[in-house]
A protein has these predicted regions:
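Active-site cavity-forming subdomains of large catalytic enzyme subunits
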Residues: 131-177
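Long, hydrophobic, well-ordered secondary-structure blocks that form the structural core
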Residues: 111, 117-123, 319-320, 327
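Active-site diphosphate/adenylate-binding microenvironment
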Residues: 33-37, 41-97, 109, 115, ...
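Active-site glycine/GP-rich loop and adjacent strand/helix microenvironment
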Residues: 1-54, 62, 66, 77-80, ...
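Amphipathic alpha-helical segments in well-structured domains
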Residues: 117, 121-128, 428, 432, ...
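Conserved small-residue
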Residues: 105-111, 146, 157-158, 212-213
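Conserved adenylation A10 loop of the ANL superfamily
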Residues: 97-111, 225
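Short secondary-structure capping/junction motifs at helix and strand boundaries
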Residues: 48, 108-111, 132-144, 235-239, ...
Length: 565
């Protein structure tokens, strides 16, 4: 049955994509119709009555009537939904509550209804249609894929509503669909232990040499999967040969029973993998699955920094962005592989763009999708079936073009994530550009990095904290640091203006001990952040963010005469 369902799914995805493309010729009309439908459906909710949605007839009235509010204004309402009260934000029953990771701020609850979920599912289907066509154009095939996200919910609210990460809700509510796509049983996503879950997902996927894709939320998580594949290659091969699941893998007894029932030995495949391991010295995705056609993960933001390490593991395998989304919304859909620009998802929400000169305004003037300009940066407001109106999650996007009349956008950074020794406002996008260029210039891929400020409250130094990959060394650290300084001046004009006059003192390089960023990630897990949502800021004004990590060396520039802090 599954053999013909996957091609059928691809056909359906292709039709959804074609329909979406037709609508991108009429972006304003599609957006206006979405808003009208939502206002009519939501006018009798508690918030709908408060805002008198039934009286709103135009987009201008909507902007005038509805304020731009942070999550804190919705929190009392989502707490009542958590307790089970109906018709607060949505007229439809809430079937799930997305709990945001809290990796870039406090945690939030986002109500999910079937209507909302269906709109997001449609965006995913459209992205699948784009991917299938992009692969076909490159003589590659779409097919089964590996995903290691947890499918474990966090719990059930007093009102009887399941809650957890957004990805868990997507997987649970779309279980039948995803079972057609996975190269491993759905039950492999159930182990609580992160390593155990990755192990069994890899184990079952390795049985399928013709697997076509690998998916993870962020590039860093794909690299972690590659690390597990390399580290546990011998044990995985042994389990494939013998038809066992190693007792050292920490599985709940019920999950182990379910997986062992579906597992059997494959000595031929084990022999093939052993030969690859012996000839190449390691297992990588590209060697284990020679038919690999794509990897799908987040693009934009800090992704380019991690992409520098992809060729070692994936060769020239195309990288697909799928959809640009958060727990609150799906913002855009990627039309092709190896591209950062994604098409505004005009059927999943009503979107407004806040120009830079309005970012500090209490009631910002906004633009519609067709009014934005290429090369400009905007904050993105969304109104959708979650019951949030003109909601600003803080993402800053750049418009890089248009697809018919719909803008192509790229996520650049989250507003508020800025670094300032004075008033220069260095963003995560600035430093990611710089660190990516440094990796290329010095031929030195890094484990990770984070730019912080020194302890001084007056004229603090930029601290360039890096961790080298095992076996790597930085032979000319002062040149590396000087190049960082020069490249950051090029990336951020405000930094460039303040550096020569020493308003911003010279940066300093700190080489952290091996395993430092693994320690940071473990700290996040201990804070309750799901392992599939792991990400951390690459800039931080929190002087304690890297507290407790060992610094192997600190390097200063020659003009830096101040004592090290």
């Amino acid at each position: 049955m599954k053999n013909f369902l996957l091609p059928l799914l691809t056909v359906v995805a292709g039709r959804a994509k074609a329909n979406f493309l037709r609508k991108t010729r009429h972006t304003d009309a599609v957006q206006a119709q979405y808003l009208r439908n939502l206002l009519q459906a939501y006018q009798d909710t508690e918030l709908g009555r408060q805002y008198r949605l039934s009286e709103i007839k135009t987009i201008e009235q909507f902007r005038d009537r509805i304020p731009v509010l942070p999550y804190s204004s919705y929190e009392p309402l989502t707490e009542r939904i958590f307790q089970g009260e109906p018709n607060i934000l949505t007229p439809d029953p809430v079937v799930y509550l997305n709990l945001t990771s809290g990796s870039t701020g406090s945690k939030k609850l986002i109500p999910i209804t079937k209507r909302f979920q269906n709109s997001l599912k449609q965006a995913n289907l459209i992205s699948m249609g784009f991917l299938a066509d992009a692969l076909r154009a490159r003589n590659l095939k779409f097919g089964k894929l590996l995903l290691t996200n947890s499918a474990q919910m966090f719990g059930r609210s007093p009102g009887g509503i399941n809650y957890g990460p957004a990805s868990v809700g997507v997987l649970r509510m779309g279980k039948f669909l995803y079972e057609q796509l996975f190269a491993h049983p759905f039950e492999t996503l159930l182990p609580v232990d992160s390593l155990a879950r990755h192990y069994v997902c890899l184990l079952f996927a390795l049985r399928q040499p013709s697997m076509r894709g690998i998916i993870a939320n962020f590039p860093m998580l794909l690299l972690r999967t590659c690390d597990y594949l390399e580290r546990y290659a011998e044990q995985l091969i042994q389990d494939i040969e013998k038809g066992t699941i190693s007792p050292i893998v920490e599985l709940e007894s019920e999950v182990r029973s379910q997986l062992e029932y579906q597992w059997s030995a494959d000595p031929d495949r084990a022999r093939e993998l052993q030969q690859i391991l012996q000839s190449e010295g390691q297992l990588t995705p590209k060697s284990a699955w020679p038919s690999l056609s794509f990897v799908a993960t987040a693009r934009g933001g800090t992704s380019d920094f991690y992409f520098e390490r992809f060729p070692k593991f994936f060769g020239e395998t195309p990288v697909f962005g799928a959809v640009y989304s958060s727990a609150e919304a799906t913002f855009s859909i990627y039309p092709d592989v190896d591209t950062d620009g994604s098409i505004l998802a005009i059927e999943t929400g009503f979107f407004e763009f806040v120009p830079q000169d309005q970012w500090e305004a209490e009631h910002p003037k906004t633009l519609q999708a067709t009014d934005v300009k290429v090369g400009e940066y905007y904050r993105l407001l969304t109104t959708n079936y979650s019951g949030f109106y003109r909601y600003d999650i803080g993402d800053v996007v750049e418009v890089v073009g248009f697809y018919n009349t719909a803008p192509l956008i790229v996520f650049r950074y989250r507003r508020g994530g800025m670094l300032s020794a004075t008033t220069e406002k260095t963003t995560e996008y600035h430093v990611t550009q710089v660190m990516q260029a440094l990796q290329q210039e010095f031929g030195l891929p890094l484990e990770d990095f984070c730019i912080t400020l020194s302890e001084s409250l007056v004229s603090p130094h930029y601290l360039v904290n890096i961790e080298l990959l095992p076996g790597q060394s930085l032979d000319n650290p002062q040149s590396f640091l000087d190049s960082f300084d020069q490249k950051l001046r090029q990336a951020n004009t405000s930094y460039a203006v303040r550096r020569p006059k020493n308003f911003i003192p010279p940066p300093r390089l700190r080489i952290l001990a091996s395993g430092s960023f693994a320690t940071l990630r473990q700290r996040q897990l201990e804070r309750g952040i799901p392992d599939s949502q792991l990400k951390f800021p690459h800039i931080s004004e929190d002087r304690q963010f890297l507290a407790g990590l060992a610094v192997e060396r600190e390097i200063k520039l020659s003009q830096d005469t101040a004592d090290a802090e």
